[in-house]
């Protein structure tokens, strides 16, 4: 009985510590997704938080135009863009299905641009309280050359960012 009381007291303390002035701290949560396993894992965390606090969820997919700027062939960009948009629709569909299964209200949106910039701008526009995203955990030269979308979002976001790291292989 004592253990049950301690667990209930702990849950009560945690819930009260993230509620301000009688309002939930998290009302709007943004989930950037690329369809990868780690982004879907991040979506699970975000949807769980949203369920707990009755928050709205915005799942977004950003068609990254930066690698294709300056392509010589005219039709190349249109073809690549269409493929990326199809990939984005699939990624958003997975997150939407997950949210609906949990009974969480979700909006999906496809954006185009530089991912970190678009994520930050979207979160600001929607007045999001939290961004939840995955990261592959790039290291070394790859990180120096390419940077980390999650790192740039953390540096520039107006709200807290929860980053879910790719699990280590066993």
Curated annotation (Swiss-Prot):
Belongs to the universal stress protein A family. Coiled coil: none annotated. InterPro entries: Rossmann-like_a/b/a_fold, Universal_stress_UspA, UspA. This is Universal stress protein MJ0531. CDD domains: USP-like. SUPFAM superfamilies: Adenine nucleotide alpha hydrolases-like. PANTHER family: STRESS RESPONSE PROTEIN NHAX, UNIVERSAL STRESS PROTEIN UP12. Gene3D superfamilies: HUPs (3.40.50.620). Transmembrane segments: none annotated.
